């Protein structure tokens, strides 16, 4: 059973027991290598099929189009009481489907869509721009996240605070209402704040922004493609502006804005729960290495949404080990690598609502264990 999970007590009539104590992931250098793990995975799991990859794009966009048609032609004709219920349902369902589209674009950024980089970048640019994501900008910062996962100094996103970095105001939010408020703000504003102001991102000595070609996030050779990302965003914004002029701002907000808000919320939630858990360590430069860093992630269970999100939720450990592997092979690979990883593999089946509150409560900052001089840091919550 994975860290933080629950189990049924067979002698207690099936009643739930108290949660088991969360066991820490081993932080010593593992007795296996990336090569050992790769050898165990069937070779076909690394094959990328253009036809199969496009089939997922077609499927997702078909479902999204059907939902759009229903909302545009029927929800707007409903009487007010029913419309007030139908619109949030549309936003939630369409947002989930478009999150799947987002995941495919993310896969393009990893060169996991096809064997052709130009095709991956073209598809990724179109899909991500439609969702107001700067494709190349995020592709490069996300690549650095994969290169530095688990490093408290060089990871790119959801970098945990050290105890010394916790603001004095945090104590006023360290209560149930404060945690709920923190979650609401994070899920609604976290994604645009990260892209625009690098909130929760790696520390840079000057302003870092995903829309700025001269941002310290990027190297000189990457800057031209940041302009392309910005052009893609501006093109979509222009289309939305024209739609607002012809169909009205309310139409744009209900048909596009609501689902996009759900997409943005899921992106933050999924990433947060993939890399935040009381069992997971972080490392400074004296201890960090790529393999241990890649293993500081955890698979989760989103129920039926696992499939809607193309299993980015429950195969994330495998994804961090082999990011060019297409999502439709990731589950098979995950099943194969579990016995090799042993306790280094983490899965938590805790319900998502409970998990996001628990992690907000328990994972406020990281610190070393007392009287330990190594560079291993663990989540704490005592302010």
Curated annotation (Swiss-Prot):
A motif (Histidine box-2) lies at residues 142-146. Residues 1-29 are annotated as: Disordered. Its main location: membrane. The keyword Lipid metabolism applies. Keywords: Fatty acid biosynthesis, Fatty acid metabolism, Lipid biosynthesis, Lipid metabolism, Membrane, Oxidoreductase, Transmembrane, Transmembrane helix. It comes from the Eukaryota. GO terms for molecular function: oxidoreductase activity, acting on paired donors, with oxidation of a pair of donors resulting in the reduction of molecular oxygen to two molecules of water. One of its GO terms (cellular component) is membrane. Residues 17-29 have a biased composition (Basic and acidic residues). InterPro entries: FA_desaturase_dom (IPR005804), FAS_N (IPR021863), Fatty_acid_desaturase (IPR012171). It is a multi-pass membrane protein. It is found in: Membrane. Its EC number is 1.14.19.-. The histidine box domains may contain the active site and/or be involved in metal ion binding. Catalyzes the desaturation of oleic acid to linoleic acid. Introduces a double bond at position 12 of 16:1(9Z) and 18:1(9Z). This is Delta(12) fatty acid desaturase FAD2. It comes from Calendula officinalis (Pot marigold). The lineage of its organism: Eukaryota, Viridiplantae, Streptophyta, Embryophyta, Tracheophyta. The gene is FAD2.
